[in-house]
Each structure stands twice: as structure tokens, then as C-alpha cells.
């Protein structure tokens, strides 16, 4: 039940994710200013992600940071309604991002500490799938509000209200774990397993027995971190300007503007399917290898978007929608895998590092994506994203 507040929080941010770029354009902003807003917000949230993770691990208190995140989102979204200045909007959004990430590390730790290691994949998959449904409903609400011609202020009030509900529910339902030890046990188990395999191989070699040493190596944490940054970079390059791209091809096809939200609803639906599948997979040993394959497929489908420019207006909308559904599916599986792996390889006290790495890549991609789209066109965006996805694939193969 403690996840219920996060459900409403994601509902609000699902609605905001598509509405905000369109709102910036509506008040006279440009693709470049969207990129600046997203990248500045992410850059400022990077050090605070690490700070929130350090503080919650140090004090063994997680609920207070979740409440801070949801309450801050409520207040700042309300303040959004008083501005039509792009510069002021960028400032408010940056402050909101700094406080918004306060719930990320505590949420990951709660899942890791409330469940045993063998259930981490299923637990992360259930959480992400459950909140993805909230995100999907938020997108549907955006479609409905757009169809009903709600103005910008009413939409922002609605987003703020959803975050207020999230705050109140979390105030009642979220509890700090009585004991925090599961991640420490996993770290000890990995060290003991590594040592026992080393002793076995050494004794076998002394006895003259031929053994394979291909599995006798520690995880390459640097490669894992590099892969996360590159994956986040490619994703942000592709998805930051994506609402504008979808809006353009929908207009070209003479379809209703509300269809933009519908396309991203289907993208989110692909994510829900991915999380449902992840809950059924229990083979922990396949997590590392499957992660690299998922990244490779993301790269291939990014290149597939190049075909959109060669098709008729209606066909381009159909292909873009299909690719976004697959992207949602692959991203869900990737996120479950990497969250579980991060709880193994990132030590306690640094639980915010996962969000820092995602933020570093996201900040760069949020700036580069709109800049490339505005300067060179969306075709270059798709090529660049595909190349960076393939570089991320190489990093995860090394890991």
C-alpha cells in the first residue's frame, strides 16, 4: 500500500511530461529553450540526488524525503500558474527538479530493504509497472483535458492536486524500515562468492585440473556507470524533443492535436507490458546479459525512426507510434535490470549515485536533443541517439 502515493505522483508527472514542452512553445518559447530548461534542471539535480541519497542512508530515515519531494512539487506546480515568462518558468522548474529527486533514492532503498535479493527484480518490476500505470493515466488525462479545451492554468492546478494527493497518502502509508541490512548482506555474499571461486580455481590449478576462469572476475563498476550515462544521454537526446516531433507529424497528417497525448499513452502502455513481463522473470543470472541486448535493440529502433521522413503523413504517425511502444517496453525491462544491479554494485551510503548517473546523461541529452533538432533536423537526432545507444551497449558488454 505504501506505493499508492507514488502512483498519484507519477500520474501528475505523466500529464506534465507532454504538457510542459507544448506549454513552453505556446508562451513563445523555442526548442532551444526547452532544451535549456530540461538540461539546467537536470544538472542542478545531479549533486542533490547524491545528497538526498547520502542523507537518507546516513540517518536511516526515508519517509521525510519522500514527503519533501511530493509537497515541493505541489507548491511549485501551483506557482507555475502565475507565470507566462519562459525565463521564470525555467527557474521554477529547476527548483522543482532539485527537490523532486529527493524521493528517488529513498524509494529504491525501501524496495531493496523491504524485500530479499531474490525478490528485487520482481519488486522493482511491480513498483515500476504500478507507477507506470499512473503515468499512463496521467497521459490519458492530458488527452481528455486537451480535448475538453482546458486552459494551461487549469491543467497545472490539476497536476498540483495530484501531487498533493500523493503527499497525503504517503504521509499515512509510508513507513521507514525497522532494520536496514539487506544491501549489506548482498555485498558480503558477493565478496564471499568471489573469494570461494578464487580458492576453487587456485586449488584446481595446483592439482593440475584444467578450469575455465572466464567467470572469475569482478563486476566492472566503471563500465556499468558509463553505460548508464550513455543510455540516459541517448534517451534524452531522443525523447526531449519527441513531443514536438510527434506534434509536427500529427499536424501534417491533419489529425487532432490531442492525438499527441494518445501516442505517448501507447508508449507508456508498452512500458506496462514490459514491467508485467519483468515480474515473471526470476533468473537473476541473465540480468547482465539481457541488459546489453536491450540497449542494442533500443539503438536499432532509434535508427528505424529515420524511415518516418520517407513515409506519407499517416504512415509516419503509425510507424512513430509503433516504435515508441517498443521503446516503452524495452525501457521497462532495462530499468528493472539496472535498478536491481545498482543495489548490488553501489554501496550503502551512495544510493543516490544511480540517479546522479542518469541525471548526468539526461542533462546532456536534454540540451543536445532540442539543439540538434532545431539546428539540423530530427533525422540527425535519430542518428545521434542510435549511435550513443550502441556505445552504451558496448559499455554494458564490458560490465
Question: Locations of the language-model features?
Answer:
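Helix-loop boundary and gating motifs at the non-cytosolic
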Residues: 1-43, 220-227, 232-261
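Central cavity-lining transmembrane alpha-helices of secondary-active solute carriers
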Residues: 36-54, 262-277
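Helix-to-loop junctions at the C-terminal end of transmembrane segments
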Residues: 48-60, 274-287, 373
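Cytoplasmic helix-loop-helix junction between adjacent transmembrane helices
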Residues: 94-133
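Juxtamembrane intracellular "pre-TM" segments in multi-pass secondary transporters
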Residues: 176-225
Amino acid at each position: 500500500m505504501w506505493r499508492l502515493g507514488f502512483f498519484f505522483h507519477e500520474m501528475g508527472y505523466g500529464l506534465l511530461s507532454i504538457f510542459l514542452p507544448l506549454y513552453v512553445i505556446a508562451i513563445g518559447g523555442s526548442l532551444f529553450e526547452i532544451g535549456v530548461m530540461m538540461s539546467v534542471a537536470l544538472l542542478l539535480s545531479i549533486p542533490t540526488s547524491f545528497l538526498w541519497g547520502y542523507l537518507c542512508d546516513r540517518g536511516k530515515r526515508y519517509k521525510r524525503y519522500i514527503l519533501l519531494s511530493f509537497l515541493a512539487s505541489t507548491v511549485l506546480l501551483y506557482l507555475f500558474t502565475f507565470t507566462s515568462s519562459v525565463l521564470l518558468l525555467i527557474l521554477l522548474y529547476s527548483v522543482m527538479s532539485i527537490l523532486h529527486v529527493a524521493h528517488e533514492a529513498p524509494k529504491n532503498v525501501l524496495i531493496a530493504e523491504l524485500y530479499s535479493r531474490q525478490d528485487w527484480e520482481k519488486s522493482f518490476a511491480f513498483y515500476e509497472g504500478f507507477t507506470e500505470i499512473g503515468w499512463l493515466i496521467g497521459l490519458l488525462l492530458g488527452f481528455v483535458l486537451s480535448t475538453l479545451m482546458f486552459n494551461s492554468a487549469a491543467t497545472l492546478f490539476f497536476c498540483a492536486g495530484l501531487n498533493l494527493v500523493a503527499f497525503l497518502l504517503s504521509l499515512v502509508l509510508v513507513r521507514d524500515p525497522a532494520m536496514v541490512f539487506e544491501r549489506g548482506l548482498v555485498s558480503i555474499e558477493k565478496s564471499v562468492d568471489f573469494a570461494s571461486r578464487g580458492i576453487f580455481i587456485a586449488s584446481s590449478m595446483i592439482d593440475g585440473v584444467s578450469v575455465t576462469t572466464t567467470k572469475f572476475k569482478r563486476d566492472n563498476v566503471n563500465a556499468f556507470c558509463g553505460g548508464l550515462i550513455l543510455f540516459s544521454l541517448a534517451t534524452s537526446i531522443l525523447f526531449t524533443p519527441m513531443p514536438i516531433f510527434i506534434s509536427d507529424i500529427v499536424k501534417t497528417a491533419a489529425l487532432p492535436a490531442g492525438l499527441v497525448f494518445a501516442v505517448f499513452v501507447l508508449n507508456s502502455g508498452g512500458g506496462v507490458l514490459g514491467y508485467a513481463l519483468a515480474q515473471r522473470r526470476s533468473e537473476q543470472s541473465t540480468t547482465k546479459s539481457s541488459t546489453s541486448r536491450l540497449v542494442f535493440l533500443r539503438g536499432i529502433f532509434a535508427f528505424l525512426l529515420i524511415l518516418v521522413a520517407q513515409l506519407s503523413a499517416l504512415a509516419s504517425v503509425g510507424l512513430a507510434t509503433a516504435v515508441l511502444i517498443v521503446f516503452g517496453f524495452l525501457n521497462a525491462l532495462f530499468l528493472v535490470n539496472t535498478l536491481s544491479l545498482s543495489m548490488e554494485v553501489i554501496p550503502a551510503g551512495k544510493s543516490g549515485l544511480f540517479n546522479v548517473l542518469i541525471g548526468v546523461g539526461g542533462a546532456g541529452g536534454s540540451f543536445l536533443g532540442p539543439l540538434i533538432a532545431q539546428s539540423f533536423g530530427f533525422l540527425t537526432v535519430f542518428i545521434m541517439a542510435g549511435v550513443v545507444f550502441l556505445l552504451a551497449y558496448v559499455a554494458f558488454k564490458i560490465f
